Amino acid sequence: MKSPALAGSLATAEVPCTHPDTTARFFRALADPTRLKLLQFILRGERTSAECVEHAGISQPRVSVHLSCLVDCGYVSARRDGKKLRYSVGDPRVADLVMLARCLAADNAAALDCCTRIPGEGEQR
């Protein structure tokens, strides 16, 4: 049974056309498990860099690289609060996108597990 979040379809919606390379790049920004983990954490509320480091369980420089990517790609906003940077998601469609992706991944888990063309976390092609 398909997830309820997939009941509607945007396939016929009127949206601005983007080049396939732009859309692929949009998804590549989320293709890293650490970035996705950080994004899901930030979706639950504004976070500092230190909170993101603790949550991700990796070094501050690595978290900084991932957060910079999320900011540069427009998924996350950063604001300075004294010496701290605080990260948040301003566009509610980002939460919708992540939820849709999770629903699709759950619905297609068996196929994704069998897919040999896209490596899983820690695997190399």
Curated annotation (Swiss-Prot):
InterPro entries: ArsR-like_HTH, HTH_ArsR_DNA-bd_dom, HTH_MetalResp_TranReg, WH-like_DNA-bd_sf, WH_DNA-bd_sf
Domain HTH arsR-type per the UniProt entry, residue ranges: 15-109
Record CDD domains: HTH_ARSR
Matches recorded under SUPFAM superfamilies: Winged helix' DNA-binding domain (SSF46785)
GO molecular function per UniProt: DNA binding; DNA-binding transcription factor activity; metal ion binding
Binding site for Hg(2+): C69, C73, C114
Alphabetical keyword list: DNA-binding, Mercuric resistance, Mercury, Metal-binding, Repressor, Transcription, Transcription regulation
PROSITE patterns in the record: HTH_ARSR_2
Stretches that traverse the bilayer: none
One GO BP: response to mercury ion
DNA-binding region: 49-68
Biological role: Negatively regulates the mercuric reductase merA and the organolyase merB in the absence of mercuric ions.
Family matches, as NCBIfam families: HTH_metalloreg (NF033788)
PANTHER family: TRANSCRIPTIONAL REGULATOR, TRANSCRIPTIONAL REGULATOR, ARSR FAMILY
Protein's UniProt name: Probable mercury resistance operon repressor
Annotated source species: Streptomyces lividans
Recorded name of the encoding gene: merR
